[in-house]
Amino acid sequence: MSSYPPRQCGLATFSSDIVNSVRLVFGDSLPIEVCALQKEENQFEYGLDVHYALTVSSIDEYRLLAEKINTRDDIGMVCIEHEFGLFEGDYGNYLLSFLLAINKPIATVFHTVLPGPNDKLKKIVKAIIDLSNKIVVLTKRSQRILISDYDCPESKLRIIPHGTHMVLWDQKDKLKNEFNYSDKTVLSTFGLISDNKNIETVLYALPEIIAKHPEVVYLVIGKTHPEVLKKEGEKYRTMLIETAKKLKIENNVFFINEFLELKQLLNYLILSDIYLFASKDPNQAVSGTFAYAMSCGCAIISTPIAHAVEALNPETGILLNEFDNSEEFQSAILKLVENKEKRLEMGRNGYAFTHETTWENIALKYAFLFAEVTESKGKLRFNFPPLKLDHIKELTTDYGILQFSKFSQPDLSSGYTLDDNARALIDMVMYYDTSSDPIALDLATIYLNFITEIQREDGRFDNYKDSNRQLTKQNELVNLEDSNGRALWSLGFLLSYQKNLPIDLVEQAQKVWDKAVVHIDGVTSPRAIAYTLKGLYYYYQVNKEMKIKTAIILLADKLLNHYHINSDDDWCWYEDYMTYANNVLPEAMLFSFLATGDLKYKKIALTTFDFLLSHYFMKGELSVISNRGWFVKGEKKSTYGEQPIEVATTIITLHLFFQVTGNEKYRNQLNLAFSWFLGNNHLNQIIYNPVNGASYDGLEDKNVNINQGAESTLCFFKAQLIMNEYKDYKKYRHLDTKNALQFEK
């Protein structure tokens, strides 16, 4: 129950974003119908989301609406978006008529919580609280006020912050050029305009700033609020325009009098250097405009509403002390106009801070709350995210794929590695086999060229090249066995698909393979052995040469020997510790069985993989080895610091073990493992970027590392390719409200 588009107000936009994000994440497994609130009957022509409309001035309609909903067995609960002024009656007490008549569970979202209530207000709000199963607020301050001033039980309360739209990082200069602001320092304010925006306070702060810095422009973005327009027309906007003229800053202040489409609005925010929030209402709890600006990477200057107090610190913006002080605004604006690096740093930090509030993450929070309120288990299913090559293409130059990104922006200074280009080659061969997309071939050619170029004369490989495409000292300081093994894996994998690939690509890979394979006898480390075994297995599928089978047996026995040396009754593993990409060891052992038919390899593969999984799957979710500290035999496993490579290799190996054994437990765990990316993790946050198809670099104890490097993105892409093979199991079922998820048939 909320105001809803085409009605133009902040709450309507908020509710539409909630509905759309839940639909995006959960599809039709969590259907939502909207009851639109309107002041007059037949006031708007609504879309298909709206099944009911409530004219808020008619108290009888509240009861009649409740009676209609009560007859619907398929409606599990009602979520009410509450704002003062939205419902009629004293402090909106007409809503109580609905709450007293409804027999469905209720979650009420308080967008504003007024402190120090009088007796009447307190009585009405307490009644809403008592008649609701759960209360949602958007800030910690609102939570404190409900507990202290309204006696709300803390157990009934849930904080779910305002959502934000995900955008790609480092688009500011590009968009400034596009909008002809390339030589400007852009200040902005947006939203439906009313005197509560207090824009005149900003205008009075600008003359001295513009005199010193004529490149400063101020964009006032948005139409006048429809309710204000009805009452007083454009009186407030006219006053602002006249004030700008009086102050002689009209050539630097631009009023964009439009209700902008979302993409255009976000573009304006991304190109803004500083966002100014000047609200004069101390009781305003939260602001969607403030949240959007921070998530778009703007440095923020704000009056001290609760949202700003909780979100801003010296690293993300400037929190003003007062609500109506032009001199304070002037000082803060000047400080950031004259310190570009500081405002860029604030923008970066704000962008990172708001990741957990992206609408996809907010959808997860609301969905889990709804499941709790309705006590429904086994009904929520994740939608399967589409494959996207965007970030892989962005990371790839004409030379190879770059190693790291700063957020979503490729970091050229990080250079290139054989490891990542080998991973990328495997991904593109897999992708081309299922899609026949010519872009995959173009990319595969780049990656194979890199592998060819970084091969030494003797057939071995270096791993590291800098941004100038020169070998680095790191190649002399670290053991390159794993990288060489990964290169052989990628070459063998490509050659196993040779029937579907251009002959020149196959011949090039064969030449590189022939030079490299002569060194496999000297491989000693378990992971290097495992990667090499994978390459040999794939090569053996199309070249049944006895020497390849002999090499597989030789290396498999080496790996088996590592197992016998390090294992005991309580530790069924190949080393006396677990580090990264652990799954590749039992995977290689199972490949050895497939190539040779020797059951001893299969037995140890099953034993060790099940041992590994026993430490990965607990309490309905996946928790892999932490990069904060390896899991040492006889010691406790570290937590957090989880990386996509470990999750993806778990998926890859579960896929193989399910194919070979047909054991349903592997498929179920496969589904559970992939749901880690989709929000089934200890933070209930997505670990992928829906905009560009990238994966984030890690899951920490309190936050997601939102850098999007090649390793993480390629691992996620390969995991998606594997999950695409399970076409009948594309959606995931939520088994309980503690996040146990699996595929829905």
Tell me what each language-model feature is.
Residues 232-259:
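Nucleotide-activated donor-binding/catalytic signature segment of Leloir-type glycosyltransferases, i.e.
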Residues 119-120, 147-148, 163-178:
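Acidic anion/phosphate-binding donor-loop and adjacent secondary structure
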Residues 335, 342-356:
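A short, well-ordered alpha-helix in the C-terminal region of glycosyltransferases
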Residues 299-302:
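Short hydrophobic beta-strand element within catalytic cores of glycosyltransferases
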